Every structure is written in structure tokens, then in C-alpha cells.
Design a protein with these regions (language model features):
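Metal-dependent C-N hydrolase catalytic cores
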Residues: 3, 10-18, 22-256, 260
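Conserved alpha-helical scaffold segments that buttress catalytic/binding sites
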Residues: 206, 210, 221-373, 377-382, ...
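Short beta-strand element of the alpha/beta-hydrolase
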Residues: 522-529
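Well-ordered, non-membrane alpha-helical segments in soluble/globular domains
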Residues: 98-108, 381-388, 531
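A structural signal for the main folded, soluble domain(s) of proteins
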Residues: 511-516, 521
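Intrinsically disordered, low-complexity regions enriched in proline, serine, glycine
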Residues: 120-122, 164, 232, 299-301, ...
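Catalytic cores of soluble, metal-dependent hydrolases
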Residues: 2-67, 73, 191, 203, ...
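Proline-centered loop/turn at the N-terminus of a beta-strand
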Residues: 219, 262, 287, 399-401, ...
């Protein structure tokens, strides 16, 4: 087992009972966790801020960060803790592995290590290396247990207490509870270490987001579990206990009110992040955009039992001051791939995000839409994940925190995560041709545009243009405008004004009509209206 002198705690092939504490102090010391000596561990954001404020000889770690800040070059952060693997199913049924498998995070870290993204030598050597080349390796961000106060920024105290109580149940009770919960919409298993792992997952997300928001790293990847985006404010569901990303967003907004006011959460997990949506549904300062399979509410998480609670359909745009801050790109079926996701980014995600102009971007990075994931049934490739990440890095001054959500094929999740991490570290995304987009997906994007048009200038007709699908397909917008042109021509002799700029011609074709005498009349009447 790698000791705390390594740049991050690295997974190796041995029993989960040997999971280290990662050299990080924590609030709760559950039985069965071994204590490891502390080495030269990286500092938390609170440690760094405190040391930065002290005039007397800050540590070598802080000096290295200050040097990298002055040079304008910061490393990419990586948060990981082996103890999160201790969350395991208490129901030892005939199925060998539950989809939300502890090996998910281990495989990602092994992939990072094999690819040379993680430094495996002493921290003292890493400091010297990063002083010379800050982007060569990922900077270790230690995970810690989230506090009850932090978790209750988005959850009820009653829900926190319910999760905490899991650590006091007997194995028999946990097994019975798992058998009851692991079905239907609840879809949750529990174990003796679920509470501790959930605290670390939430705390790891918080520290990742804070390090990015504070400028200690340029961006970061939190390799954490259990995931969070299905957890509601008062209940656990969908493999999720605490909703990590909203907790991280709220803590950053509270601790950095001047520099982290607006947060953009992009969720590319194949399942709708119902919990994230509901926590920010009326919040004007958090933009939540989700790309997910909806399938008329038949795909998980489906429709809530309470019809008053919004689901993942594309007409759910937010409420009150939060209208327009909830964007659901709800695919009609599985089978979506690179073409659909890149089109969604180019036509919907990025235009709205740029208009929102966030201070921090958090990616709820589920990789179950990846090619090879049996549960997701979609075909998004690692190069596509790299391109989507690269586009998001153009926002918020590059402050992007990637937090793991779902993804259940070990090979697909590790390769997809590697593509994202390499992009965060500055490697250009691989060249890709724009794949074709299905007619069904094009219709969804057009409907999303229409649903969001009242709230975003970039979504209004003429500003955004959904591409044609195939040589024999026409946009409904073009058909309607062509008919309007014919009527105006027959009744008033009007004809279209030629637009010379090629970039504008397609979007505004047949939209600017004039009468033949426009150049000879002294008075001109302009009529401007929606199509």
C-alpha cells in the first residue's frame, strides 16, 4: 500500500480493509479502519489560506503553490481516498458485483497512474518537479469527511441522521435494509461503512471545488464514490446518499461570496440528476444543465410519485427567479452518441453557459453514457468526453471541477475519465469529424431551444440554428418561414433581402422581406416580430 508520502493514495490489489486514511485528519474514526502515519501530505484549502496569511516562513508546499501562482501556471488537482471503497453491499446475494462497484474508482486511479498523470515518488520530489513544470503531474487534493453543517446546506438534518444511523446497524439489519431498498426508484444498497464513505465523497467534492474556486489549482478531478446526483434533500436514492456537487457548490458560494457567486453545473450522466435539479430549481445563481435519456419518463429515475415534483422532461425550466436556470436535454431513447452530444453542446449547452457567465463550472461526470456501458446503452467515446471538457474549460476562466457520478463498465469509465483528465491537464482533444445526428435528437434540441427561448437571448429564433439532418430533411422553422414568404409575396409583392454574410445567411434566410420601392421612398416602416 502506498504511504502518505505519495502524491496521492494509489489503489493496489489487496483487501479493502487495508485502505489508508490518506494522511488526512477526520472527524470520525470507525472501527476497522487502520491508522497510517502522516507524511508530507498536501494541504487543504483552509490550511493553504491560513499559511498564505502568515508572514512567518510558510511550508514548502505553500511556497511551491505561491511560486506557481506567480508564474501563472497551476497544476490540475486530483482528489482520491481509498476509504471510499469501503462502501459495499451488505446483501451478499448471488450476483457477484453490484453495478456501483468499489472497483470503479480504483480502476480510474490505476489508469491515471499507468498513463503517467500521477506522480508515485516522494512529495518532496514532486514539489521540485512542479516548480519547474506545474502541469506535468496532478496535484493531490486530500479528501476529508464533510461536516454535518456542510451537508445540511442542501439536506435536512433528518436525512443526515438517517445516513449516520447506518453505521450503528447490525449486519443482519443492513442486509435486510438493502434487500428492501435496492429495487424500484429507491435503488440503493447500504453497508456498515456507507456513512463514512459518503462523508468522504462529499468532503472530497467540497475540497476539490474549493481548491479550484480559490485558485490553488487550475482545475481538478474528484474520483469519488458513492455518487450523489440522485439524492434528494430529504432522502437517499439511486446509489446516492449525499448530493456531493450541490454541497460543494453551496460551500463555495458561502465561503467565496465575491468570487464564486454564479455556478454552472453540467451533468452528462446518462440518468437525470433529479436531486441536483430540485435543490436549485428556483435559484437564479445556479445554472443546471443535464443531458440524459428520458424516454418519456420510463428511464431511471423516471417520474416522481408526487406529480408536483418536476421530472427530467425538457419543459422543466425552473421556477420563480430560477426560470431558465434549469435546462434538460432529454433524449427520447438510448443509443445516443458523439454526434448528439456534440450538437447539444454546440447548440444549447455552450451558448446558454456563455450567456450565464459562471464563476465556477462543476461537471457531474457520470460515464454511463460511454460506449460499452450496458446500463446506459449509449455510445459516447473518450474523444467526445475530451471535446466536451475542452469546451467547458473556456468558461469561468478555466475553473472547472470534475466530480465523478455514475458509470459502471470498468473499462469504459477508466478510459473516459482518462480522456477528461488529459484534457484538464492541457492535452488537446483528439481530432474528430462531426458525426451525424439523428432526427429524433435534432427535434429534441429544437424543442429545448423553444423551451429556453423566453429566458436566453441565444436561444431565440435566428440566433441558433439546428443543423439539417440528412440531405432530404428541412427544419420546420424553414418550412414555416418559406410559406410566410410566399403569402407576403402574393399579397404585398414583398421579396427577401439578400444577406451577403455567409455566416448569417442560413439563419436569416427568408426572414428579412422588403417591398420593391424601399430604395425610392423617403419614409421606411420597419415591422419587427417573432416568426
Amino acid at each position: 500500500m502506498a504511504s502518505s508520502t505519495n502524491s496521492t493514495v494509489e489503489p493496489e490489489d489487496h483487501a479493502m480493509a487495508d485502505a489508508p486514511t490518506n494522511g488526512v485528519g477526520h472527524n470520525h474514526h470507525p472501527a476497522g479502519l487502520r491508522e497510517y502515519r502522516e507524511g508530507v501530505a498536501p494541504l487543504s484549502t483552509d490550511d493553504i489560506d491560513a499559511a498564505m496569511d502568515e508572514a512567518e516562513s510558510p511550508s514548502e508546499t505553500v511556497e511551491a503553490l505561491k511560486l506557481m501562482r506567480r508564474r501563472g501556471m497551476l497544476p490540475t488537482g486530483c482528489c482520491y481516498d481509498d476509504r471510499m471503497k469501503l462502501h459495499a453491499n451488505a446483501d451478499f446475494g448471488p450476483t457477484p458485483h453490484h453495478p456501483e462497484d468499489p472497483r470503479r474508482i480504483e480502476e480510474i486511479m490505476k489508469m491515471f497512474k499507468r498513463a503517467g498523470l500521477i506522480f508515485t515518488g516522494p512529495d518532496t520530489e514532486l514539489l521540485d518537479i512542479l516548480k519547474e513544470n506545474p502541469t506535468k503531474y496532478m496535484w493531490r487534493i486530500p479528501a476529508r469527511e464533510a461536516t454535518k453543517q456542510e451537508i445540511c446546506t442542501v439536506h435536512t438534518p433528518g436525512h443526515y441522521d438517517w445516513v449516520e444511523n447506518l453505521s450503528h446497524l447490525s449486519t443482519r439489519d443492513l442486509r435486510a435494509l438493502s434487500m428492501t431498498l435496492d429495487q424500484g426508484r429507491a435503488s440503493l444498497y447500504v453497508g456498515g461503512m456507507s456513512y463514512e464513505a459518503a462523508l468522504l465523497s462529499a468532503g472530497g467534492c467540497i475540497e476539490t471545488c474549493k481548491n479550484v474556486a480559490a485558485g490553488n489549482v487550475k482545475n481538478a478531478f474528484a474520483v469519488i464514490r458513492p455518487p450523489g446526483h440522485h439524492a434528494e434533500y430529504d432522502s437517499a436514492m439511486g446509489f446516492c446518499f449525499f448530493n456531493n456537487v450541490p454541497i460543494g457548490a453551496r460551500v463555495c458560494q458561502q465561503e467565496y461570496p465575491e468570487t464564486c457567486r454564479k455556478v454552472f453545473i453540467l451533468d452528462w450522466d446518462v440518468h437525470h440528476g433529479n436531486g441536483v435539479q430540485n435543490m436549485f430549481y428556483d435559484d437564479p445563481n445556479v445554472l443546471y444543465t443535464s443531458l440524459h435519456v428520458y424516454a418519456n419518463g420510463e428511464f431511471y429515475p423516471g417520474k416522481p410519485d408526487n406529480p408536483m415534483i418536476p421530472d427530467g422532461d425538457l419543459d422543466k425550466v425552473g421556477d420563480g427567479p430560477g426560470k431558465g436556470k434549469n435546462v434538460n436535454i432529454a433524449w427520447p431513447s438510448q443509443g445516443m452518441g458523439d454526434g448528439e452530444y456534440l450538437a447539444a453542446f454546440q447548440k444549447i449547452v455552450m451558448p446558454i453557459a456563455k450567456e450565464f457567465n459562471p464563476d465556477l463550472v462543476i461537471i457531474s461526470a457520470g460515464f454511463d453514457a460511454a460506449d460499452g456501458d450496458e446500463l446506459g446503452g449509449c455510445f459516447v467515446t473518450p474523444p467526445c468526453y475530451a471535446h466536451m471538457t475542452h469546451m467547458l474549460m473556456s468558461l469561468a476562466g478555466g475553473k472547472v471541477a470534475v466530480c465523478l457520478e455514475g458509470g459502471y463498465n470498468l473499462q469504459a469509465i477508466s478510459h473516459s475519465a482518462l480522456a477528461v483528465a488529459r484534457t484538464l491537464m492541457g492535452e488537446p482533444p483528439p481530432k474528430m469529424d462531426m458525426p451525424p445526428i439523428s432526427k429524433e435528437a435534432a427535434r429534441v434540441l429544437a424543442r429545448v431551444q423553444a423551451a429556453q427561448a423566453p429566458y436566453w437571448e441565444c436561444m431565440r429564433p435566428g440566433i441558433i440554428d439546428i443543423q439539417r439532418v440528412g440531405n432530404d430533411a428541412s427544419r420546420l422553422h424553414d418550412v414555416i418561414r418559406g410559406y410566410q414568404r410566399q403569402v407576403l409575396s402574393e399579397k404585398h409583392g414583398m421579396f427577401p433581402l439578400f444577406i451577403q454574410r455567409e455566416a448569417l445567411f442560413r439563419s436569416f434566410e427568408n426572414q428579412v422581406l422588403i417591398t420593391p420601392d424601399v430604395q425610392t421612398k423617403q419614409k421606411i416602416l420597419f415591422i419587427i416580430h417573432d416568426p
